[in-house]
Amino acid sequence: MTTQRSPGLFRRLAHGSLVKQILVGLVLGILLAWISKPAAEAVGLLGTLFVGALKAVAPILVLMLVMASIANHQHGQKTNILPILFLYLLGTFSAALAAVVFSFAFPSTLHLSSSAGDISPPSGIVEVMRGLVMSMVSNPIDALLKGNYIGILVWAIGLGFALRHGNETTKNLVNDMSNAVTFMVKLVIRFAPIGIFGLVSSTLATTGFSTLWGYAQLLVVLVGCMLLVALVVNPLLVWWKIRRNPFPLVLLCLRESGVYAFFTRSSAANIPVNMALCEKLNLDRDTYSVSIPLGATINMAGAAITITVLTLAAVNTLGIPVDLPTALLLSVVASLCACGASGVAGGSLLLIPLACNMFGISNDIAMQVVAVGFIIGVLQDSCETALNSSTDVLFTAAACQAEDDRLANSALRN
């Protein structure tokens, strides 16, 4: 008679559901912050290490994946970058428009009394776009060190096309390097429960949420608008693309991408997570290896919402009337600003003065609005990143599935 041994604890942890493990890490992090504040602050190192590891591996992952996919691209094989790019831009503009409607329906006001410190926002939209264009011609080593994904994409695409003319041994080497980096990414992601345990513990211990209660209405409008975009606007765009129930895909992306992004608060750190999810969904590698890092740079629905809501809150506070054409123009400006947010230190918050300038709001008052943004940043930045990053993989999957459906229907007709 033989007895079958039950799998050990380590084996269960290594092969169990990552989402369930993350939930356990989340609960344990909250409990530790509640029981012992010093201990919770100490384990914050685990979260810092996890986010640092993701940020470290993401640039080289993007470089190798894009190089490998372009170098090994077969002639005549179609990618779906243009449809995805269109979805990115449409999604960002739709988010800004939804934020305008939400802000009119639930107007918020601010207490403009704090200072934003020595922060230098860009002087205009031209400067934002100039920074975005200049990042394309960055030194490749500098781009890798600083996580400049526009620069990394440009070099990876250029080297990929150049390597198309190389011999098969070189192409195989690039492909093997890409697979090796992908393996390292999977290894890092397995430590997500420990990392999120550290992040949650330290965040609750060091900041708490007591300071957020003074801005409860503003946060409700911000987070409510982001939920509206995630659960209504994005599903409508996905349904328009794939013509079937979008919610299984939407909820999967929120669960397996948005949860990570919420706690890491970094679109760059979430690139490896999104790449792994695309592989799990069996999407075209040539497509997602380009669209995911591109989305982390320009697909900024959450940033568009933040810029729009905080700007209109300042407008309401000062009693400035806003007509429909001006509101539509604000949506366009917020969308353009959001697309350039990755190239600005401080991200979406420091682009608020550009939008405020539309209404003749002085820079001093605009920087006080930015200061409010930093106060609520614990929750605002987490929700914004979760929406931005989960939308990257959502729109990539929608475009790839739509193309697969088109090819299948074409084959049936023939």
Curated annotation (Swiss-Prot):
Matching Gene3D superfamilies: Sodium:dicarboxylate symporter
Entry's transmembrane regions: 16-36, 46-66, 84-104, 143-163, 180-200, 218-238, 300-320, 332-352
Membrane topology (UniProt): Multi-pass membrane protein
Keywords annotated in UniProt: Amino-acid transport, Cell inner membrane, Cell membrane, Membrane, Symport, Transmembrane, Transmembrane helix, Transport
Molecular function via GO: neutral L-amino acid:sodium symporter activity
Catalysed reaction equations from the record: L-serine(in) + Na(+)(in) = L-serine(out) + Na(+)(out); L-threonine(in) + Na(+)(in) = L-threonine(out) + Na(+)(out)
Cytoplasmic topological intervals: 2-15, 67-83, 164-179, 239-299, 353-414
Domain of life, source organism: Bacteria
Keyword Isomerase (UniProt): no
InterPro entries (UniProt xref): Na-dicarboxylate_symporter (IPR001991), Na:dicarbo_symporter_sf (IPR036458), Ser_Thr_transp_SstT (IPR023025)
Keyword tRNA processing: no
Cell compartment(s), UniProt: Cell inner membrane
One example of a Gene Ontology biological process annotation: serine transport
Main location: membrane
Any one GO cellular component localisation term in the record: plasma membrane
Periplasmic-side segments: 37-45, 105-142, 201-217, 321-331
Free-text function comment from the UniProt entry: Involved in the import of serine and threonine into the cell, with the concomitant import of sodium (symport system).
HAMAP family noted in UniProt: Ser_Thr_transp_SstT
Family statement drawn from the similarity comment of this UniProt entry: Belongs to the dicarboxylate/amino acid:cation symporter (DAACS) (TC 2.A.23) family.
Protein name: Serine/threonine transporter SstT
Species in which this protein is naturally found: Shigella dysenteriae serotype 1 (strain Sd197)
Encoding gene per record: sstT
